[in-house]
Amino acid sequence: MYVKVNPSSYSVAIYEIAKESNKIKTFHEQFSFVKKVIEKNPQLITFLKNDEIALEKRFELIDEIFGSLEVDVKNSIKVALVRNMIFVLRKIIVDFLKITNYELGIKFAKVITAYPLSDSELEKIQKKLNEKTKKIVEISTEVDEKLLSGYKIIFSNQLYERNYNNDLQKIKKTIIKGKEDEK
């Protein structure tokens, strides 16, 4: 039997609950946490999808893992479980976060460096971006050893970079252009 699934309607419903209870920021933070947990532990969704395990046991696991979260956040996960929507829980959360990102004025930046950044370095970058944009900026990081040193920041379709690899590429282009001009 074919069942049509619309994760966006669940996301909007969760948003409405958050808005009615004046807890949009709290829900945003808590669903961000839930998203990280299910991304780091894909076996959790596999366990929750397993109909051979009693529903009560699966509810207990949700309460155990997410016990400190708002009741409505936990209940949203349980509703997805009962309605056989747990396999799209991540999509529901992503859609919800997109709605709340807009509502809360949150922007995103990707910081690519040659080595892992410390928490204090990330905080400095985030603070600088927050000040520059007058928005809340959430940062994701990536390590790219080809940079040799320095960084790239991708933010709002703009690229800011200061790294040796980029400098070497510019020098290379200048040298090649110079040789072509000599001919």
From Swiss-Prot:
It is a peripheral membrane protein. SUPFAM superfamilies: N-terminal domain of the delta subunit of the F1F0-ATP synthase. The keyword Ion transport applies. It holds the Pfam family OSCP. One of its GO terms (cellular component) is plasma membrane. GO terms for molecular function: proton-transporting ATP synthase activity, rotational mechanism. It is found in: Cell membrane. It comes from the Bacteria. Signal peptide: none annotated. Keywords: ATP synthesis, Cell membrane, CF(1), Hydrogen ion transport, Ion transport, Membrane, Transport. F(1)F(0) ATP synthase produces ATP from ADP in the presence of a proton or sodium gradient. F-type ATPases consist of two structural domains, F(1) containing the extramembraneous catalytic core and F(0) containing the membrane proton channel, linked together by a central stalk and a peripheral stalk. During catalysis, ATP synthesis in the catalytic domain of F(1) is coupled via a rotary mechanism of the central stalk subunits to proton translocation. This protein is part of the stalk that links CF(0) to CF(1). It either transmits conformational changes from CF(0) to CF(1) or is implicated in proton conduction. PANTHER family: ATP SYNTHASE DELTA CHAIN. NCBIfam families: ATP_synt_delta (TIGR01145). Belongs to the ATPase delta chain family. F-type ATPases have 2 components, F(1) - the catalytic core - and F(0) - the membrane proton channel. F(1) has five subunits: alpha(3), beta(3), gamma(1), delta(1), epsilon(1). F(0) has three main subunits: a(1), b(2) and c(10-14). The alpha and beta chains form an alternating ring which encloses part of the gamma chain. F(1) is attached to F(0) by a central stalk formed by the gamma and epsilon chains, while a peripheral stalk is formed by the delta and b chains. This is ATP synthase subunit delta.
